[in-house]
């Protein structure tokens, strides 16, 4: 059974005030505090080079360049000079600001660093050229510079001269030796000892030739000055046979650039060819592990292991065979009786077919002289 519900619709219904009780709401006022304000004056950046202008020249920044600490450079720090791009067409006032910045350039503690001095020299030259080109591009150049500009122009060269000194630089060829070989590079070095280098270069001579003492000339009673025949190295150099130089052959005036080598050559091409001797020995014998500079020397050495002896003595009744032609030539002296090596001591006239035998014989004289 559905219930009956009554609905009534009223318009502009108002609730009497005596039925609903209204309460007053108290609103507290908000405290008012004075906040201090600052007036900020912004600089006119229309002419600033950072915002597209050109009143300020490019700044020069010294940035630290940290090296790899894995190679022992823990306490070393390099300075890298970095400049911003040059802005063309700036006015004379910019040049004055650039001169002021030169006096504020940061310098390292040690001004004796040659590489840093060279960099400063190039920077000073660049600043001077920039100043000159700016004055030439001026629309109305003044005939007589102002006192301030003249003082600044005259003071800058003096300052750079006092800081950089009178050192001159030149390019030199340096030999660099690596695991793969030796090569030459061009480096800048101070030209402080030009006179000493010229004197040393003029005094460079060919190493002394003692071959005449092996052919019959006798030694002086006091011996050769600066030569100790008891030293195996000096004795080997003394008994070393040097090739004869023809009369028309030019003198050898180019020294070997390798440290410790005193050989001389006719030209730089011959010296560069000789430098391969000081290079790495990459051709290794698989039998004994001996290394050689050239593959031809390795092939000649391998004859010792194979037992091959292609060089045979042609004298009747001999028939000896040798692996090297040099050994065959030395052997032939036995048949010919040729003994080109003569004892250089005055009291001895013995002769030998090989220089090694003469070297052994000289040691007997040296031992007798040192132990009378």
UniProtKB/Swiss-Prot annotation:
Q: Where is the composition biased (Low complexity)?
A: 126-136
What ranges does the record list as Polar residues composition bias?
A: 154-165, 186-196
The UniProt-reported impact of residue 103 to N is: In a breast cancer sample; somatic mutation
Asked whether the UniProt record includes Transcription among its keywords, one would answer yes
Q: Where is this region: Disordered?
A: 126-172, 186-210
Tell me, in one coarse class, where this protein mainly resides.
Answer: nucleus
Could you state one GO biological process linked to this protein? positive regulation of transcription by RNA polymerase II
PROSITE patterns per the record? ZINC_FINGER_C2H2_1, ZINC_FINGER_C2H2_2
Q: Where in the cell is it found?
A: Nucleus
**Biased composition annotated in UniProt, kind: Basic residues:** 137-146
User: Is this entry keyworded Zinc-finger?
Assistant: yes
* Single GO molecular function: cis-regulatory region sequence-specific DNA binding
Q: Name the GO cellular-component terms.
A: chromatin; nucleus; PcG protein complex; transcription regulator complex
| UniProt-annotated stretches for the region Mediates transcriptional activation | 32-102
Pfam (any one): zf-C2H2
Q: Which residues cross the membrane?
A: none
Annotated region Mediates transcriptional repression: the residues are 237-372
Q: Which SMART domains match?
A: ZnF_C2H2
Zinc finger spans (C2H2-type) are 254-278, 283-305, 311-335, 341-365
Tissue-wise expression: Expressed in kidney, liver, spleen and testis but not in colon.
Supply the alphabetized keyword list: Activator, DNA-binding, Metal-binding, Nucleus, Repeat, Repressor, Transcription, Transcription regulation, Zinc, Zinc-finger
Q: Beyond the main fields, what else does the record say?
A: The gene encoding this protein appears to have arisen by retrotransposition of the YY1 gene in placental mammals. It is encoded by a single exon found in an intron of the gene MBTPS2.
Q: What does this protein do?
A: Functions as a multifunctional transcription factor that may exhibit positive and negative control on a large number of genes. May antagonize YY1 and function in development and differentiation.
Protein family (similarity comment): Belongs to the YY transcription factor family.
Protein name (database record) = Transcription factor YY2
Q: Which organism is it from?
A: Homo sapiens
Q: What is the lineage of its organism?
A: Eukaryota, Metazoa, Chordata, Craniata, Vertebrata
């Amino acid at each position: 059974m559905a219930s009956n519900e009554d609905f009534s619709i009223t318009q502009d219904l108002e609730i009497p005030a005596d039925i609903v009780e209204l309460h007053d709401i108290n609103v507290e006022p908000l405290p008012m505090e004075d906040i201090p304000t600052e007036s900020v004056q912004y600089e006119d950046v229309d002419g600033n080079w950072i915002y597209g202008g050109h009143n300020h020249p490019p700044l020069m920044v010294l940035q630290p360049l940290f090296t790899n600490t894995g190679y022992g450079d823990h306490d070393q720090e390099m300075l890298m000079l970095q400049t911003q791009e040059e802005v063309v067409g700036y006015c004379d006032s910019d040049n004055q600001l650039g001169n002021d910045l030169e006096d504020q350039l940061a310098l390292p503690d040690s001004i004796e660093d040659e590489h840093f001095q060279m960099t400063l020299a190039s920077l000073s030259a660049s600043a001077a050229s920039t100043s000159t080109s700016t004055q030439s591009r001026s629309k109305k150049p003044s005939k007589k510079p102002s006192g301030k500009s003249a003082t600044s122009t005259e003071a800058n060269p003096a300052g750079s001269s006092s800081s950089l000194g009178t050192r001159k630089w030149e390019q030199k060829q340096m030999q660099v030796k690596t695991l793969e070989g030796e090569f030459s590079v061009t480096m800048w070095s101070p030209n402080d000892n030009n006179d000493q280098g010229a004197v040393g270069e003029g005094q460079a001579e060919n190493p002394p030739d003692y071959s005449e003492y092996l052919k019959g000339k006798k030694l002086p009673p006091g011996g050769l000055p600066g030569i100790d025949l008891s030293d195996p190295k000096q004795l080997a150099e003394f008994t070393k046979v040097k090739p004869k130089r023809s009369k028309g052959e030019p003198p050898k005036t180019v020294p070997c650039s390798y440290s410790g080598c005193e050989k001389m050559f006719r030209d730089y091409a011959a010296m560069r060819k000789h430098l391969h001797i000081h290079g790495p020995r990459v051709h290794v014998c698989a039998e004994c592990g001996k290394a050689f500079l050239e593959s031809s020397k390795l092939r000649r050495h391998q004859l010792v292991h194979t037992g091959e002896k292609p060089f045979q003595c042609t004298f009747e009744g001999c028939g000896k065979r040798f692996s090297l032609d040099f050994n065959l030539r030395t052997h032939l002296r036995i048949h010919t009786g040729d003994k080109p090596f003569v004892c250089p001591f005055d009291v001895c006239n013995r002769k030998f077919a090989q220089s090694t035998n003469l070297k052994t014989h000289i040691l007997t004289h040296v031992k007798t002289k040192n132990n009378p």
